[in-house]
C-alpha cells in the first residue's frame, strides 16, 4: 500500500478536531478544506492573486490561513482578517479546483468568526448596522430611501450637484457610481401590492414565486418589471409573497451570519407554499441556494427546511430555458457580448441558458467575451469597501470587452452597476442590459408591430 493510500485509509478527513483558535459558534467546516492539497490550480482563477501576486491573497493561501487558525498556529487578528476580507468570494477557485474545495464557504464562515471576535466599532460599526440591520431587511424603509433618491434625481438637485462640481469632493469610485446610478422607478412590490398573484397572459401552465429583492426592487425595478412580464407571457402565474425580505447575502458576506439566518428563516416561511422560487439577481439566487450552510450547526428542523427551500430556487434564465418559452418574432438588431455573473456561473452553474435566450432573439449577434466568467469587481459591496482592488479587477474585465459590441448583457444588478462604471471610466459606449430585459423588449416590439397595447 502506498503512503497516499495508507493516509486515505487511516487518517480522518481532518485532524484539527478542536478548531483551536475558533472560539465562537458557527465555526469553519473542516470538511471543506480536507481535500485541499495546495496544488495551485486555483491560482490563475483568482482575481486578487492576479493583481497582488501574494500567496495570502490566493485561494490556496486563504485556505492555509483558515486551517492555521484551527490548528492553533494563528490567532483571529488583523493578520488573518485582511486577506479573508480581501477575497471577492467570486467562487472561480471552486470551479477551477479538481477537488471542488468550497473556498467561498470557508471564507464566509471565517468572516463570521472574525466579526464575533472583532466587531466593527465607531462610525464603521454604526454605518454597517444602519444598512445591514436598519435598512435592507425593511422593504418600507427601502422604499422611502428610494423615494428620496427619486426626488434627488428628478427635482434638479442631481443636475445642480453635477454642474457645481460637488462630485469632485467625493471619492472617485463613489462619484463614478453616482454618475451611472439607474433612475428610480415604481417598485414591483408597490405596483402589484393589491395582487396576491399576477396572472399569466393566456393559459396558465405553471405558478412560480418571485424574489423581488431589496435593493433590486428599488434601484432596478425595471428589471423586476420585465421579469414579471416575461414570466406571465410564458404562461406563469407569478406570486410575489409580501413577507419576503432581503436574501441576506450582504450580511453573510460581511460576517453577520446571525442576521443572515434570521432573514433566511423569514424567506423560508414566506415562500413555504410554493414549488418554484424564481430569482433574477445572481447574488440573491445563489444565497438562497446556500441557506442550508447557515443551519449546519442548527437544529434539524431548520436545516431540513433550508434544504427543501434551496432545492426550489432557480434563476429566471434557467427556468425559462428548462420549462419552455415563446421565442420572440420581432428583431432587436444589436451586436452584444455576455458577461457571466460569478454567482450565476460559478455559484449556480448557469452559463449556457442565458446565452441561448439571447440568441433566440432575432437580430441579436453575440460576440464572445474572453474570460467571460472573470469577476468584474462588484462582489456585493466590495467595490465600495475595497475600491482599489475592485478597480483593478474591473480594469482587467474591461480589457476583455469586445470593442465592437453595442451592449453587454448579464444577470446580476451589482455587475450591471460595476460594468456601467467601467464603461464610464474607460470611455466606452456600450449599453448595459439584463438578459431578461432584452427578451422583454423583443416581446414588446412584437406586440407593438401587431398593434397590441
Residue ranges and their predicted role:
Residues 71, 92, 96, 255:
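Short His/Asp/Glu-rich catalytic/ion-coordination signatures at enzyme active sites or charged loops
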Residues 20-33, 73-84, 199, 232-234, ...:
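Short, intrinsically disordered, charge-biased short linear motifs at domain edges
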Residues 34, 53-57, 75, 251-258:
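Alpha-helix capping and helix-loop boundary segments enriched in small/acidic/polar residues
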Residues 30-49, 77, 81-101, 343, ...:
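Cysteine-centered iron-sulfur cluster-binding motifs in ferredoxin-type domains/subunits
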Residues 2-25, 49-82, 100-130, 429-438:
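Non-heme iron-sulfur electron-transfer modules
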Residues 103-453:
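Iron-sulfur cluster-binding electron-transfer modules in prokaryotic oxidoreductases
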Amino acid at each position: 500500500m502506498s503512503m497516499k493510500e495508507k493516509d486515505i485509509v487511516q487518517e480522518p478527513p481532518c485532524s484539527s478536531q478542536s478548531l483551536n483558535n475558533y472560539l465562537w459558534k458557527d465555526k469553519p467546516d473542516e470538511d471543506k478544506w480536507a481535500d485541499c492539497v495546495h496544488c495551485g490550480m486555483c491560482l490563475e482563477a483568482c482575481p486578487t492573486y492576479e493583481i497582488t501576486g501574494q500567496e495570502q491573497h490566493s485561494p490556496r493561501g486563504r485556505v492555509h490561513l483558515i486551517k492555521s487558525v484551527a490548528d492553533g498556529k494563528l490567532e483571529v487578528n488583523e493578520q488573518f482578517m485582511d486577506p479573508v476580507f480581501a477575497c471577492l468570494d467570486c467562487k472561480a477557485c471552486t470551479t477551477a479546483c479538481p477537488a471542488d474545495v468550497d473556498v467561498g464557504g470557508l471564507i464566509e464562515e471565517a468572516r463570521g468568526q472574525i466579526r464575533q471576535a472583532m466587531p466593527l466599532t465607531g462610525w464603521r460599526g454604526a454605518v454597517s448596522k444602519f444598512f445591514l440591520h436598519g435598512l435592507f431587511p425593511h422593504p418600507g424603509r427601502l422604499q422611502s430611501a428610494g423615494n428620496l433618491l427619486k426626488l434627488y434625481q428628478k427635482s434638479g438637485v442631481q443636475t445642480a450637484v453635477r454642474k457645481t462640481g460637488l462630485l469632485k469632493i467625493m471619492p472617485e469610485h463613489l462619484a463614478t457610481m453616482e454618475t451611472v446610478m439607474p433612475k428610480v422607478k415604481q417598485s414591483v412590490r408597490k405596483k402589484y401590492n393589491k395582487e396576491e398573484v399576477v396572472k399569466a397572459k393566456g393559459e396558465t401552465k405553471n405558478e412560480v414565486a418571485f424574489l423581488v429583492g431589496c435593493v433590486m426592487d428599488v434601484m432596478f425595478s425595471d428589471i423586476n418589471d420585465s421579469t414579471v412580464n416575461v414570466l406571465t407571457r410564458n404562461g406563469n402565474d407569478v406570486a410575489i409573497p409580501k413577507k419576503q425580505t432581503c436574501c441576506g447575502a450582504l450580511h453573510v458576506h460581511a460576517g453577520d451570519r446571525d442576521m443572515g439566518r434570521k432573514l433566511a428563516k423569514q424567506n423560508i416561511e414566506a415562500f413555504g407554499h410554493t414549488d418554484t422560487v424564481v430569482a433574477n439577481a445572481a447574488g440573491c439566487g445563489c444565497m438562497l441556494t446556500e441557506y442550508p450552510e447557515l443551519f449546519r450547526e442548527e437544529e434539524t428542523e431548520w436545516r431540513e427546511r433550508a434544504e427543501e427551500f434551496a432545492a426550489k430556487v432557480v434563476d429566471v434564465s434557467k427556468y425559462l430555458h428548462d420549462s419552455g418559452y415563446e421565442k420572440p418574432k420581432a428583431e432587436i438588431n444589436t451586436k452584444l457580448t455576455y458577461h457571466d455573473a460569478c454567482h450565476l456561473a460559478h455559484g449556480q452553474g448557469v452559463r449556457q441558458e442565458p446565452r441561448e435566450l439571447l440568441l433566440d432573439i432575432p437580430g441579436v449577434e453575440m460576440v464572445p467575451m474572453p474570460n467571460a466568467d472573470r469577476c468584474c469587481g462588484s462582489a456585493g459591496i466590495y467595490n465600495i469597501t475595497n475600491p482599489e482592488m475592485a478597480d483593478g479587477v474591473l480594469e482587467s474585465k474591461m480589457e476583455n470587452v469586445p470593442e465592437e459590441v453595442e451592449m453587454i448583457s448579464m444577470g446580476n444588478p451589482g455587475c450591471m452597476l460595476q460594468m456601467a462604471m467601467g464603461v464610464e471610466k474607460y470611455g466606452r459606449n456600450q449599453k448595459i442590459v439584463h438578459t431578461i430585459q432584452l427578451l422583454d423588449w423583443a416581446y414588446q416590439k412584437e406586440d407593438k408591430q401587431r398593434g397590441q397595447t
